[in-house]
Amino acid sequence: SLAEHGSLNDIDLHIRDITPHPLPGLPLDVTASIFGKADANAKVEDIALGIVHMVLQTIGQGAVFASLNGDIKNIVLIGNLTRLPQCPDIFPRLEDMCDVHFKIPEYAEYRTAIGAALCYIRNREYKDIFCGKC
């Protein structure tokens, strides 16, 4: 894919672009602004990687934010996006910074469909028990 041949160095603004010194909890290579350095001359491969990075960062940060009000430290990622080759680079960084653990189970790309099927079966069983004719 295009994204596999891209670089974020000319797309995302990193902490190192703002200061030469690491900030507490923010290493120099962490993204400060997604697409913060992109311009009209950016390579298509870099833009593709920037989009993939943005999507995965948003998913990861959304999951982290959703876990903040509870004791959730383990986050399971499922669906086709888990097959993107950029996942092993992005989620471990979030784990280090946010004190959570992301788990991508085997066959993660099928887990959404399996969950929908189980929900359908369980709901149907529930209706059969409590509604009689449903």
Per-segment meaning from a language model:
Residues 1-41:
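Conserved ATP-utilizing enzyme core subdomain
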Residues 29-39, 85-98:
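Acidic-glycine-rich active-site phosphate/pyrophosphate-binding loop
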Residues 42-46, 95-103:
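Glycine/charged-rich beta-loop-alpha catalytic/anionic-binding loops adjacent to active sites
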Residues 60, 64, 92, 113-121:
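Predominant activation on well-ordered alpha-helical scaffold segments within soluble catalytic domains
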Residues 64-68, 72-94, 105-109:
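Glycine-rich phosphate-binding loops at beta-strand->alpha-helix junctions
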Residues 103-134:
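Glycine-rich phosphate-binding/hydrolytic loop that grips phosphoryl groups
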